[in-house]
UniProtKB/Swiss-Prot annotation:
UniProt subcellular location: Cell membrane
Record's compositionally biased regions (Low complexity): 429-439
Tissue specificity annotation: Expressed in head region of the larva. In adults, expression is seen in the periventricularis magnocellularis (PVM) neuron.
InterPro entries from the UniProt entry: GPCR_Rhodpsn, GPCR_Rhodpsn_7TM, Musac_Ach_rcpt
SS bond partners: C99-C180
Protein name: Probable muscarinic acetylcholine receptor gar-1
A Pfam short name: 7tm_1
GO terms of molecular function: G protein-coupled acetylcholine receptor activity
Length: 713
């Protein structure tokens, strides 16, 4: 505020500048630019409030509009009139009335700016620290009343101090040349008291409120982070508890599996629960025979424990092996045969076929004897189409032809790849909790091309009356067992071989379509042995089945049938082959035995990913709450507004407080003038402070710079 008095002599109001014309031109250019920037910037703030609904609907933005109006007036009257006084050599050339009016406007608008900044700071503090109460109390009417009071109070104070000073004190206006100054500046104590009352007190209050806003924003951020940490800790504890339970369950399951493996005699067992389910699915009732096992201490690797007992152990092994092999072939064929269920008549015919098979085997003719297991059977074994059973009765030959026609179904590569070890069976193994105890018996057939003789001649050469008697004795028991394991059905089997062939063709088409759909979705990796010819490769006189590797580790159990000789003393006994001669089933290494290995690995990966999933929250930016956003917005606004205010206004009030005591002799005139211009620069910088602190004002300014002054609804 100017500290000058108006001279009473009108002659002293003439223009007499001590500065050169170029200096005056440069100064006027700078002042005009600053004045226009102040006017345009604050006018844009008022216009943004009118055209931007997001700004106008917030009641607190009215304080900003009030501050912009006061700064706008300062830009109109402050810069030009003070520049006239400075360039004229610190003399007022416009008269006494103009001097008093300019002093009144200048002091009033400066105090209005101070009080408005105080209102903005208090509004931001209450909205952050006492949100509920303040929002309930705040209303447009109350806000407008506070704004009016912020204008009326400075006008009343400085109207009395400027226009009524002479009436209050009885002193005439002091004249010192052409000086124009406020009359109360002549009393240093009143001058200092006024500056302390309306500036320094207000500045301290604003700093306290600013500190409160900063602390509130900090506390909200701490609370939000603590809440997020508690939430993450809760999620981690829940997931860890779940994973601990799963780990304990898997550990107990693994211990149970190890205990079951320790009880196995030959390395594989059959689970009766899964056996019953598979038999019911194939259309059979649960058999009453006991399970089969491989006895490593016996001369015969495949023995039968249960229903048949004979005096001769060697003949008993042959008979039981043939009966079990016949039952296995019959169940495998009928489970995929689209005809009626087996009947009692069929059982009798099967018993006759069994007798023929037993006789042919007793003669020393090697035959295919797939190992029987009432669990999940591996259907990958392919029956040799050239192997047929010759009998002396026409009915037996017809039955054998039907059985051989069904063997075509299993001789196809694609069909075997689908029927063997489907994923659905893997799921069933997990549901039955017996995946580790499931034995996959690889059935294989052997073809002898060297020294091949008719079976009838071999039977006549090696058959003995005692063996035939043993076969007849076992016939009744075998037929009875088959009848007990097959449900009664009055329908007769009238399916012809041609119909069976048609069904085989249709089944192949269905399986081919299923394979195409499955390959398009899963696309499993196939091993090098996936493409093999239908004809079997002969290595050491035995046929190796086709191996398909789809990339999964499947538990396997291999039983190798090795020909020890073609003499009648060793009629095709089976034994467990060494590791280098074993066949692999859907596995390249041939060492995996547990299906649970797959699920265990997947489960372990899921456990690790699920445990460390919440940690990813720390890697991305934390989402702020609504209260945090409000606090940070208020903090930014107050930082710019109060920061500009304190930096630009404090130098002048420091010098003005000292100025009254030393009469201007202790303060250089240049510093005093510069500090006064800094007060005006605060009005020029406030619009930029709004734009930097508030995104809504920034977007509105960009619209107006592009020439868009349309009101947004």
């Amino acid at each position: 505020m100017p500290n000058y008095t108006v001279p009473p002599d009108p002659a002293d109001t003439s223009w007499d500048s001590p500065y050169s014309i170029p200096v005056q031109i440069v100064v006027w250019i700078i002042i005009i630019v600053l004045s226009l920037e102040t006017i345009i910037g604050n006018a844009m703030v008022v216009m943004a409030y009118r055209i931007e609904r997001n700004i106008s609907k917030q009641v607190s933005n009215r304080y900003i509009v009030s501050l912009a109006i006061s700064d706008l007036i300062i830009g109109i009257e402050g810069f030009p009139f003070f520049t006239v006084y400075v360039l004229n050599g610190d003399r007022w050339p416009l008269g006494w009335v103009a001097c008093q009016t300019w002093l009144f406007l200048d002091y009033t608008l400066c105090l209005v700016s101070i009080l408005t900044v105080l209102l903005i700071t208090a509004d931001r503090y209450l909205s952050v620290c006492h949100t509920a109460k303040y929002l309930k109390w705040q209303s447009p009417t109350k806000t407008q009343l506070l704004i009016v009071m912020s204008w009326l109070l400075p006008a009343i104070i400085f109207g009395i101090m400027i226009y009524g000073w002479q009436a209050m004190t009885g002193q005439s206006t002091s004249m010192s040349g052409a000086e124009c100054s406020a009359p109360f500046l002549s009393n240093p104590y009143v001058n200092m008291g006024m500056y302390v009352a309306y500036y320094w007190t207000t500045l301290v209050a604003m700093l306290i409120l600013y500190k409160g806003i900063h602390q509130a924003a900090k506390n909200l951020e701490k609370k939000a982070k603590a809440k997020e940490r508690r939430h993450i800790a809760l999620i981690l504890s829940q997931r860890l508890g779940t994973q601990v339970g799963v780990s304990l369950m898997l550990q107990s399951k693994a211990e149970k599996e190890k205990a079951e493996e320790a009880q196995k005699d030959s390395g594989y067992t059959s689970n009766q629960a899964g056996d019953a389910n598979n038999l019911r699915r194939f259309g059979f009732s649960e058999p009453e025979t006991s399970q089969f096992r491989v006895d490593p201490n016996s001369n015969n690797n495949l023995n039968v424990e249960g229903s048949l007992n004979t005096e001769n152990d060697q003949n008993l092994g042959v008979i039981e092996e043939e009966r079990s092999g016949f039952l296995s072939r019959r169940e495998s064929n009928e489970s995929y045969y689209p005809g009626p269920h087996p009947t009692a008549a069929n059982s009798r015919r099967c018993s006759e076929m069994e007798k023929v098979s037993l006789l042919s085997e007793s003669d020393g003719v090697p035959s295919t004897r797939p190992a029987k297991s009432y669990g999940r059977l591996s259907l990958r074994s392919r029956y040799s189409a050239s192997e047929s059973i010759t009998t002396t009765h026409e009915n037996d030959e017809k039955e054998v032809e039907k059985a051989d026609s069904l063997q075509k179904l299993f001789a196809d590569d694609e069909l075997g790849s689908v029927l063997n070890f489907k994923e659905e069976k893997l799921k069933n193994t997990d549901s039955n909790n017996d995946s580790d105890t499931t034995s996959v018996i690889l059935q294989r057939s052997r073809k002898y091309k060297k020294n091949k003789r008719p079976r009838s001649s071999r039977r006549s050469e090696h058959s003995t009356p005692r063996q035939i008697a043993k076969v007849k004795q076992a016939e009744g028991t075998a037929a009875q067992l088959i009848e007990e394991s097959v449900p009664d059905d009055d329908q007769t089997e009238t399916i012809e071989v041609k119909r069976t062939d048609r069904w085989v063709v249709s089944m192949k088409k269905r399986i081919a379509r299923a394979l195409i759909r499955r390959r398009s979705t899963t696309r499993p990796e196939r091993g090098s042995s996936s493409n093999s010819d239908d004809s079997s490769s002969e290595v050491e006189g035995e046929e190796k089945p086709e191996v398909r590797n789809n990339g999964l580790k499947i538990p396997q159990l291999t039983v190798n049938n090795e020909n020890r000789g073609e003499t009648s003393s060793q009629p095709g006994r089976d034994r467990l082959a060494p590791p280098n001669k074993t066949d692999t089933f859907l596995s390249a290494s041939g060492v995996s035995r547990k299906i649970s290995t797959i699920s265990t690995v997947i489960t372990r990966e899921k456990v690790i990913s699920s445990i460390f999933a919440p940690i990813a929250v720390f890697n991305r930016g934390r989402k702020q709450t609504k209260a945090e956003k409000r606090a940070h917005k208020a903090f930014r606004t107050i930082t710019f507004i109060v920061g500009f205010f304190a930096i630009l206004w404090s130098p002048y009030y420091i010098m003005a407080t000292v100025y009254g005591f030393c009469k201007g002799e202790c303060i250089p005139s240049f510093l005093y003038t510069l500090s006064y211009y800094m007060c005006y620069l605060n009005s020029s910088g406030n619009p930029f402070a709004y734009a930097l602190a508030n995104r809504q004002f920034r977007s509105a300014f960009m619209r107006m710079f592009r020439g868009n002054f349309n009101k947004v609804a």
